[in-house]
A protein has these predicted regions:
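Structural/interface elements that position substrates and couple domains in central-metabolism enzymes
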Residues: 1-166
Length: 166
């Protein structure tokens, strides 16, 4: 969903909650947080619905529409960047005769580095998931139509396309 979609609908009673379906860490089956964008009164009503369906045993983050629309794009761009970064370091390690898994263990030992998405697969040295494949290009299109240039995200996307084509 392009950033600004809810605002363009001009309906105060719209609440957006970015989806995290499928096999992601933040699946709807066991979420640890829910982002709700919109009027706070309506967000509270949605929170009440969640508490009835899923016992509400997770945190709620209330934000405006645009922030909610951009939040999932930001998360998926970070994951795409991390996958691309780790695959690049796997290539560098291989060139130096170093086992990537040993290098990765050193990297994730630092508490500031989350180990998710740091594994690499030689037969697939790129990201290829439904969400990343749709969200990264969608964000780039949305940015372009708003005259925004995100050079890092654009480069990550281009590197991924190059790796897929090999």
């Amino acid at each position: 969903m392009p950033v600004g979609t809810c605002e363009s609908l001009c309906k105060d009673n719209i609440v957006i909650s970015p989806e995290y379906y499928g096999t992601t860490q933040h699946s709807l089956e066991s979420p640890n947080f829910v982002v709700l964008g919109g009027n706070e009164n309506y967000c509270c009503k949605v929170t009440q619905l969640y508490s009835r369906v899923k016992n509400g045993a997770f945190s709620y983050i209330y934000v405006d529409w645009k922030t909610a629309e951009l939040a999932k794009y930001m998360e998926n761009c970070w994951i795409a960047t991390k996958v691309t970064f780790c695959n690049e370091f796997a290539d560098i390690a291989k060139a130096f005769g170093i086992q990537y898994e040993r290098l990765r263990q050193c990297f994730v030992a630092d508490e500031r580095v989350n180990p998710s998405h740091t594994y690499v697969y030689p037969e697939q040295p790129y990201y290829d998931s439904h969400c990343l494949n749709k969200d990264i290009p969608a964000l780039l299109v949305s940015c372009k139509s708003n005259k925004i240039k995100p050079p890092l995200t654009d480069k990550v996307h281009m590197i991924n396309l190059e790796r897929k084509s090999k």
